[in-house]
Structures are given as structure tokens and as C-alpha cells.
């Protein structure tokens, strides 16, 4: 079978707290692990999408509206919907599988993810990824 869930692939989460949110695959575990004996992957996604910026907004307000909140999570393949989009953002060094073991590691990983996603948003690339799903 062809593996189409590869790193940097944009996905939509279908179940749980972040259902309907967009995420990007960081690392895949096709054969599972000892703790999770099923196919799953580590994803980093957008918890809170940036708001729409208009021309008359001040610089301060524009900066506030351009903020992104991120999340990092291990997700079962059954709870993902893959999309045709890929996101060329480098999260491999910031988000590693053992990040979820301790709180302080997770906080630093979230800050790194947030920074790289905000930078991607401000350059105007991958516009689809930063728009809220309307459903």
C-alpha cells in the first residue's frame, strides 16, 4: 500500500478537542509503538487561527490579529483527514516525539511551533492553511 501520510502533509483532525482544526504531520509511526500499537503520527497544528486584518487597523492591532496559537499532539491515523496540501515549515528539530513527556519540553516546543507558523503566515505563503474551516 502506498504511504500518503508523510511529514509536511496538511491534515484536518476529525475527533477530539481539536476536531476541525488544521495540522501538519511532523513524524509518522506506521507500525505503532509499544504504548500505542496502531498507526499514528505526531502533528503540530493551529489551535486559534489569525483574524482578518483590514487596512485601517493600527500596527498594534494588526500584530494582535496576526497571532497564532499552536498545539502538538499524537493522533491516530483513523482520526485524520489528509488534504492535497503540503506545508514547507521545518518543525523536525522543534517538535520531537519525546516532547510530550514533560510540561517544560512541551511549552518550548509550542513556542517554537508558534514562532515558525506565525512567520509562515506573515510571509503570505500557504494561505489555505491559515484560514478557518467553515462548517
From Swiss-Prot:
GO molecular function: structural constituent of ribosome
Keyword field: Ribonucleoprotein, Ribosomal protein
One GO cellular component term noted in the UniProt record for this chain: ribosome
Matches recorded under Pfam families: Ribosomal_L27e
Domain of life: Eukaryota
Known outcome of mutating residue 49 to Y: In RPL27-3, RPL27-4 and RPL27-5
UniProt GO BP: translation
Family: Belongs to the eukaryotic ribosomal protein eL27 family.
Protein name: Large ribosomal subunit protein eL27
Amino acid at each position: 500500500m502506498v504511504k500518503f501520510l508523510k511529514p509536511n502533509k496538511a491534515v484536518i483532525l476529525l475527533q477530539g478537542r481539536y476536531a476541525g482544526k488544521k495540522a501538519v504531520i511532523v513524524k509518522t509511526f506506521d507500525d505503532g509503538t509499544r504504548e500505542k500499537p496502531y498507526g499514528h503520527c505526531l502533528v503540530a497544528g493551529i489551535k486559534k487561527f489569525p483574524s482578518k486584518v483590514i487596512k485601517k487597523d493600527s500596527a498594534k492591532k494588526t500584530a494582535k490579529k496576526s497571532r497564532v496559537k499552536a498545539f502538538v499532539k499524537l493522533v491516530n491515523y483513523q482520526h485524520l483527514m489528509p488534504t492535497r496540501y503540503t506545508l514547507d515549515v521545518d518543525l523536525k528539530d522543534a517538535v520531537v516525539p519525546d516532547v510530550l513527556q514533560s510540561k517544560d519540553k512541551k511549552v518550548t516546543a509550542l513556542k517554537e511551533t508558534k514562532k515558525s507558523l506565525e512567520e509562515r503566515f506573515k510571509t503570505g505563503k500557504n494561505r489555505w492553511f491559515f484560514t478557518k474551516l467553515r462548517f
